Amino acid sequence: MKHPFSRLFSFGEKEQEEAGGKQEREEVRNIPVASIIPNRFQPRTVFDEEKIAELALTIRTHGIIQPIVVRECDNGQFEIIAGERRWRAVQKLGWTEIPAIIKNLNDKETASVALIENLQREELTPIEEAMAYARLIELHDLTQEALAQRLGKGQSTIANKLRLLKLPQEVQEALLQRAITERHARALIALKDKEKQLKLLQEIIDKQLNVKQTEDRVLKMLEAGERKPKPKRKAFSRDMRIAVNTIRQSLSMVENSGVSVHSEEEEFDDYYQITIRIAKK
C-alpha cells in the first residue's frame, strides 16, 4: 500500500517494496515521551513557544485528538515523522506517554513526509519554506516546474522562494526571526552586492522601513551605482590575443579527438582567465 505522499512524489519499485513490504496496521500505541526524538529533517527551525503553550492548554482540556506519527530507531528510540508541536506541548504538561502511530519509513520518505506536512500547514517562515522546496528538489531530483505541479503551486512561486536562499545568511536569519518580511527580502535581491544588502537590511530594521520605502531605497542605490564611472579595462595586447587564440585552437583539437572538454572565459581588470574542465570519461 502506498503512503499518502507517494501520490505526489513517486518512488521506485524497490523503495515502495522497502516502505510497504511489511504490512502496517495503523495501531495507536502509547509510547514514552522521553524515548521520542525530533525529526532530523524537520524544516521548521523556529517554534513559537506561545503557540506551543496554547496547544498545551487545548490538549489538557480535550486530549490528543490526532496521534503523532513516529518511526522506530535501532537504539529503541522513536523519531517523529509528524506531530512535533504536539510532542512539545505534552512535554510542557509533564505527560510521560503520548499516543502514536508507528510507521516503517526510510530516510527519504521520512524527510518527504515532514517537509510536505509542514508545507501544507502554511505556518513556515518564507526561508523555511524555501529550504523545504530546495530539499524536496534534491531528494526527488525534480525541476522547479515539476515540484510546482506536484504541490499544486505556480512555478513562479517556487522560483521566488528559492531566490531567497541566494541572499546573505544575515538576511535569511532576519527572515527566519520575522524581523523583515518576504517582500523586504525580495527587494534586497535586486542589489546583488552583499555589502549593500546588509547595509540596507540594518537600515530596514533600525528605521522600521516598510516595503515601499525599502524598494525606493533599493532604486536609489542602484541609480547611484550606475552613475559611478566604470574603470577602463586594459586593452588586449597582440601577445595576449595570440595566447588566447592558441588556447582556443588547442581546445578545439582536443574536442575533435573525442574528449569532452568544457571551458569558461572571464575578463578581469588585470588578467584574462580561462578555466578548463576535462571529463575523466
Swiss-Prot record:
GO terms for molecular function: DNA binding. It holds the Pfam family HTH_ParB. InterPro entries: Chromosome_partition/occlusion, HTH_ParB/Spo0J, Nucleoid_occlusion_protein, ParB/RepB/Spo0J, ParB/Sulfiredoxin_dom, ParB/Sulfiredoxin_sf. Signal peptide: none annotated. Residues 145-164 bind DNA. GO terms for cellular component: chromosome; cytoplasm; nucleoid. Keywords: Cell cycle, Cell division, Cytoplasm, DNA-binding, Septation. It is found in: Cytoplasm, Nucleoid. It comes from the Bacteria. One of its GO terms (biological process) is positive regulation of sporulation resulting in formation of a cellular spore. Residues 1-26 are annotated as: Disordered. Residues 12-26 have a biased composition (Basic and acidic residues). Effects nucleoid occlusion by binding relatively nonspecifically to DNA and preventing the assembly of the division machinery in the vicinity of the nucleoid, especially under conditions that disturb the cell cycle. It helps to coordinate cell division and chromosome segregation by preventing the formation of the Z ring through the nucleoid, which would cause chromosome breakage. Belongs to the ParB family. This is Nucleoid occlusion protein. It comes from Geobacillus thermodenitrificans (strain NG80-2).
